[in-house]
Amino acid sequence: RVWRQRHQIDAITSLNRRLAEAEREGEMGQSVVELREAAEHLLVDSPYRQVFEENLLGIDAGSHATELVVALERGYAEPDERARALIQREVVRTGLFIAASPYPALDLLLVAWRNARMVNGIAQIYGLKLSFPVRWRLYRMILQNMAFASATETVLDSASEGWASNLLVNLGARAGQGVAVALYSLRIGRQAMRVSRIAPEQRPLVDRNLARLILGSIRERSAGTK
């Protein structure tokens, strides 16, 4: 069981990269059919299987790789929305937890646990039912991906551009720590969405507006507790 779950995660990552390459190279023909079949195989246990099947019906040897990716994106519309809602809820709670804590450094272990739980919740939305060893492996993979992400790609950079910096200055130390932890947790949520999806990221799965909404919630609630 554990081996099968690990293989599923690896297969999703591999197909995601292959689809991105096929789209970049403008592939069409039999290679697109093979990619569609590989996607259908990995989505066989997805709670959204029927939605994906309906969207993939028109993909054949005459289709371009981009059409396949767009069809998969349509299938991911609902789980993406659910995952973003989960991320928003959990990240706000985590940020407020740190902002209200008198011992934020000691609470970082609990934050790690909350983030790991969030990752598992996101995986479940996409139909990935993982045992503890595989969940831990997925969490480590996400942290590694974040370590290698370019600075221009991070949610922190896209959310700030002076705005988040001003927010941190205006808040107290504890609330500022809550915001920093929230931004980090937001990046973890985004990476969890990435590694749970077959389709490569066409547009930011977690955008600037969501980051602003989360940070605004922490600011308002922190101010209300003073």
Stretch-by-stretch model annotation:
Residues V2-N16, A116, M193, R197:
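Juxtamembrane helix-loop transition segments at the membrane interface in multi-pass membrane proteins
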Residues Q5-A99:
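Membrane-proximal, non-transmembrane interface segments of integral membrane proteins
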Residues D45, A112-A116, F148, T152, ...:
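Alpha-helical transmembrane segments of polytopic integral membrane proteins
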Residues V70-A116, S131, R135-F148:
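Transmembrane alpha-helical segments and their cytosolic interface motifs
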Residues Q124-L183:
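Hydrophobic alpha-helical transmembrane segments and adjacent short intramembrane/lumenal linkers
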Residues A173-K226:
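Acidic, carboxylate-rich catalytic segments that either coordinate divalent cations
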